[in-house]
């Protein structure tokens, strides 16, 4: 099983220590709950990963680990085959000892859009909600974060994260917990909170914004990234059963409406800092994610529309502060 003991020891010494009142019991319950059918085999695969520590680690320009001397051809083949057991790899990319995990999403492109607009992360304690396999956690560490905590209930993402961590020399500056935001108490302990690609999956988006606010310290910063539609502050798309083949999409507001939602929840200094159409080069099928991707979800005769006839994915980034 996954051992969270190092994380407990870490937060016992900082301003997250009150989380220990409930977190160990929650994760113990998670360990007993209905796990994914492949979870035990994924954990066994994790145990079979070789112990490797990088002689060069670059988390500033990517998630890039290298070793001198490099892996032999046979070692690379063996490691590649192990990492492929964790497919599909959706968020990345990762470059690990000459093995390039070309993920479905170019999450580095999103990071490049976000980074110029946020407060410096040096020395900060950070929460990333819906963090996927933790790619952005490592980039936060690369920007000097003291501790980057991700939450995501998807068990494959947890195993992918732990695989990468093991190949980064068991780095303890980032941690992923298999929880949803609704399972967190109001910690009020994070300097920065990220919620990227989550809001439109929530049945009650304002409740989600309140939950994010409750995790921040006073004067803490929220980075919110979401699907949006063009329009004024009164515009919101409520799609039918599917949007771009996704079932669980409830509200896609305009960026101006999201700004009003944030202000209604008590955030201040709210700014829309970026808005960009998602290109098929940013989300696509790869050798590490071989099922359908964005190009399959768009109208084949008009790439400005989804296959259901809605506006094609447009994403906005907003920055806000908790007073």
Swiss-Prot record:
Keyword Transferase: yes
One function term, GO molecular function aspect: transferase activity, transferring alkyl or aryl (other than methyl) groups
UniProt xrefs under Pfam families: Methyltransf_9
NCBIfam families from the UniProt entry: PRK15068.1, tRNA 5-methoxyuridine(34)/uridine 5-oxyacetic acid(34) synthase CmoB
Bilayer-crossing regions: none
InterPro entries: CmoB, Mo5U34_MeTrfas-like, SAM-dependent_MTases_sf
EC number: 2.5.1.-
Family according to the record: Belongs to the class I-like SAM-binding methyltransferase superfamily. CmoB family.
Biological process terms in GO annotation: tRNA wobble uridine modification
Binding site for carboxy-S-adenosyl-L-methionine: 91, 105, 110, 130, 152-154, 181-182, 196, 200, 315
Catalytic reaction annotation: carboxy-S-adenosyl-L-methionine + 5-hydroxyuridine(34) in tRNA = 5-carboxymethoxyuridine(34) in tRNA + S-adenosyl-L-homocysteine + H(+)
The keyword DNA-binding is annotated on this UniProt entry: no
Source organism of the structure: Photorhabdus laumondii subsp. laumondii (strain DSM 15139 / CIP 105565 / TT01) (Photorhabdus luminescens subsp. laumondii)
Biological role stated in the UniProt entry: Catalyzes carboxymethyl transfer from carboxy-S-adenosyl-L-methionine (Cx-SAM) to 5-hydroxyuridine (ho5U) to form 5-carboxymethoxyuridine (cmo5U) at position 34 in tRNAs.
Record's protein name: tRNA U34 carboxymethyltransferase
UniProt keyword list: Transferase, tRNA processing
Subunit structure comment from the entry: Homotetramer.
